């Protein structure tokens, strides 16, 4: 699953990045995305579902949907998602 597929108000753990997007991966890492970090989708835009806003390490970050599609995530359990 990738971050752009994560439902609103769901939490996940970053598992890695799609291969073949090295420049984008570097940029995402520079703004704080890293394996093992918790991420939560807060809002999805109205038009073309852009942008996506997420909470990452206490910060709120807006991403283009195509950029979020490079970030691989794993869902946290339902208990952790009720917070």
What are these regions (language model features)?
Residues 1-8, 81-83:
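C-terminal regulatory/oligomerization modules of transcriptional regulators
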Residues 3, 25-32:
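Short, surface-exposed secondary-structure edge patches
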Residues 46, 50-83:
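C-terminal structural segments of small proteins and small subunits
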């Amino acid at each position: 699953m990738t971050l752009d597929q994560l439902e609103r108000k769901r939490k996940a753990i970053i598992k890695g990045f799609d291969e073949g997007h090295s420049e984008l991966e570097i940029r995402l890492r520079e703004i704080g995305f890293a394996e093992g970090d918790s991420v939560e989708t807060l809002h999805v835009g109205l038009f073309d579902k852009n942008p996506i806003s997420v909470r990452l390490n206490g910060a709120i970050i807006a991403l283009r949907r195509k950029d979020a599609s490079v970030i691989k995530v794993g869902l946290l359990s339902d208990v952790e998602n009720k917070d």
